[in-house]
C-alpha cells in the first residue's frame, strides 16, 4: 500500500515526492516495525489486543513512521501540477487518516515497563474501542487502501477509463461515512448494550450498497474490452479480486445479522470470510498490481514479465487455492455452529467440543491443500519476477515487438 500509493500519487498529481529522504525513512522505519514484531510476538511480549498486539515502544515507532508517510503523501498532493485530485488518492487519503486515528486511540496505554503496558480503557469500553479499531482497520487498511489501488490499476491495465467517475465519488463518501459505525457486529451477544449491537448490524447491512457500488464500477470498467480477459492474465487477477471483494462484502453484512451471527460466531466460517477478503481480494489485487509495476521498475513496458504463461499458471493456482481454502472453512463453520447448538431432549449438549474438532479435520486437510497451492503459486511468481529482472535488453525489445 505504501509503495503503490506513493507511486500513484506522483503520476496522478504530475509531481515528484514531497521528500525522498522522508520516504526512505518510511521504508526503513516500517522494516524496523516488522522486525520488532517478529521478535516480540513469539516471546509473548504483547498487549493481547487483536490486530494491536504490539507493545507501546513499537506503537510509538509506528506512529512516527505513519506521520512521515502522511507528510510525504499529502505534501505531494499539495504540490500537484493538476487541479483535480484523482479518486484513487481520495481512498489512499482516507486510509492514511483513518488508520492514524484508529491506531492512536486504540493503542493508548499506561506503560509499566519497557515491554509491558495496560490499556487506558477497561471492560466493555475496552472491547468496544478494540472492535471499533479492529473492524475499521479492515475497513480502511484492507478495503479503502486497496480500492485506491483498484481505481488506478484496473483502468490502467484495461486501458479504459473508469466506468463511472460519479459512482466512484458516491462510493467513496458512502463507504467512509458508514464503515466506521459497523464495528459492534463483532460483539453480538456480549455485554455491549443491545442498542449498540443493533446499530452495528444495521450499518453493516447498509454497507453492502457502497461496497457493491465499488465492485460494479471496477468490473464494468471492462465494458467494451471483455475480450482482454482471455489474453491478459494480469487483468484476470485484478477482475477476479473484485469478484472476491463483492462476495466478501455480501457475506460480511449477512454475518452481521444477529440470527446468522449466533450460528457463525467463533466458528471457522469467520476464518473463511476473512480469507475470501485476505486471499481473494487483498492478495490477488496486490499480485496484479505487482505484475503491472515490476517490469516498469526495470525500464520495461507495464506487465511485460518474463513469462505470460507463468502468470496464467499463477492465476489458476491462486484462484483454486483460495476457493479450496474458503469453501472448506465455510463447510466447517456451518457444521461447528450446528453441532455446538444441538441439544438433547433433556437440555444437555448433543456433541462435545472435541467431537466438533474431530469432525472438522477433513476441512482442515482441504484448507492445508488450498493454502499449499496458493503458496506454491507465490513461488511461481517469485521465479517469474527473478527472471524478469535478469532479462537482457535485446530479449525485452524482441518481446515488445
Annotate each language-model stretch with its function:
Residues 393-401:
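Short, highly charged, low-complexity non-transmembrane loops/tails of multi-pass membrane proteins
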Residues 143, 147, 161-265, 270:
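Membrane-embedded translocation segments of transport machinery
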Residues 77, 83-89, 97-133, 150, ...:
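Juxtamembrane/interfacial segments at transmembrane-helix boundaries in multi-pass membrane proteins
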Residues 102-111, 182-189, 242-270, 278, ...:
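Specific lipid-exposed transmembrane alpha-helices and their immediate membrane-water interface residues
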Residues 17-33, 84-100, 158-177, 225-251, ...:
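Interfacial and helix-entry/exit segments of alpha-helical transmembrane bundles
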Residues 1-4, 60-74, 136-152, 204-219, ...:
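Hydrophobic cores of alpha-helical transmembrane segments in multi-pass inner/ER membrane proteins
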Residues 1-84, 110-119, 179-206, 306, ...:
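Membrane-interface helix-loop-helix modules in multi-pass inner-membrane proteins
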Residues 51-61, 123-139, 197-207, 265-279, ...:
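Short aromatic-rich membrane-water interface segments that cap or initiate transmembrane helices
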Amino acid at each position: 500500500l505504501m509503495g503503490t500509493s506513493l507511486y500513484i500519487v506522483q503520476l496522478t498529481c504530475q509531481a515528484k515526492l514531497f521528500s525522498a529522504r522522508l520516504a526512505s525513512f518510511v521504508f526503513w522505519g516500517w522494516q524496523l516495525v516488522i522486525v520488532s514484531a517478529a521478535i516480540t510476538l513469539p516471546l509473548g511480549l504483547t498487549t493481547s489486543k487483536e490486530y494491536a498486539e504490539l507493545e507501546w515502544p513499537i506503537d510509538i515507532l509506528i506512529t512516527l513512521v505513519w506521520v512521515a508517510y502522511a507528510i510525504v503523501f499529502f505534501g505531494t498532493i499539495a504540490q500537484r501540477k493538476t487541479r483535480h485530485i484523482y479518486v484513487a488518492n481520495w481512498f489512499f487519503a482516507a486510509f492514511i487518516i483513518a488508520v492514524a486515528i484508529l491506531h492512536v486511540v486504540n493503542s493508548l496505554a499506561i506503560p509499566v515497563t519497557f515491554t509491558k503496558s495496560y490499556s487506558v480503557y477497561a471492560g466493555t469500553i475496552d472491547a468496544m474501542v478494540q472492535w471499533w479499531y479492529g473492524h475499521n482497520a479492515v475497513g480502511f487498511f484492507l478495503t479503502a487502501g486497496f480500492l485506491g489501488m483498484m481505481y488506478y490499476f484496473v483502468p490502467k491495465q484495461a486501458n479504459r477509463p473508469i466506468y463511472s467517475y460519479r459512482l466512484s465519488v458516491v462510493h467513496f463518501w458512502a463507504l467512509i461515512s458508514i464503515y466506521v459505525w459497523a464495528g459492534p457486529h463483532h460483539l453480538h451477544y456480549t455485554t455491549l448494550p443491545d442498542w449498540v449491537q443493533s446499530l452495528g448490524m444495521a450499518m453493516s447491512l447498509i454497507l453492502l450498497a457502497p461496497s457493491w457500488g465499488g465492485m460494479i464500477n471496477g468490473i464494468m470498467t471492462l465494458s467494451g474490452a471483455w475480450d482482454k480477459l482471455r489474453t491478459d492474465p494480469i487483468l484476470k487477477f485484478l477482475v477476479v479480486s473484485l469478484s472476491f471483494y463483492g462476495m466478501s462484502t455480501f457475506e460480511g453484512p449477512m454475518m452481521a445479522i444477529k440470527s446468522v451471527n449466533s450460528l457463525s460466531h467463533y466458528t471457522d466460517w469467520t476464518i473463511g470470510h476473512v480469507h475470501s477478503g485476505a486471499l481473494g481480494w487483498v492478495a490477488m489485487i496486490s499480485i496484479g498490481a505487482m505484475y503491472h509495476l515490476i517490469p516498469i521498475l526495470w525500464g520495461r513496458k507495464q506487465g511485460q514479465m518474463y513469462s505470460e504463461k507463468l502468470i496464467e499458471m499463477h492465476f489458476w493456482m491462486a484462484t483454486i487455492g483460495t476457493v479450496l481454502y474458503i469453501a472448506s472453512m465455510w463447510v466447517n463453520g456451518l457444521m461447528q455452529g450446528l453441532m455446538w447448538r444441538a441439544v438433547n431432549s433433556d437440555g444437555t449438549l448433543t456433541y462435545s467440543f472435541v467431537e466438533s474438532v474431530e469432525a472438522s479435520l477433513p476441512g482442515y486437510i482441504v484448507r492445508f491443500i488450498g493454502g499449499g497451492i496458493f503458496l506454491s503459486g507465490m513461488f511461481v511468481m517469485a521465479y517469474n519476477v527473478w527472471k524478469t529482472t535478469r532479462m537482457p535488453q535485446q530479449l525485452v525489445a524482441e518481446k515488445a515487438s
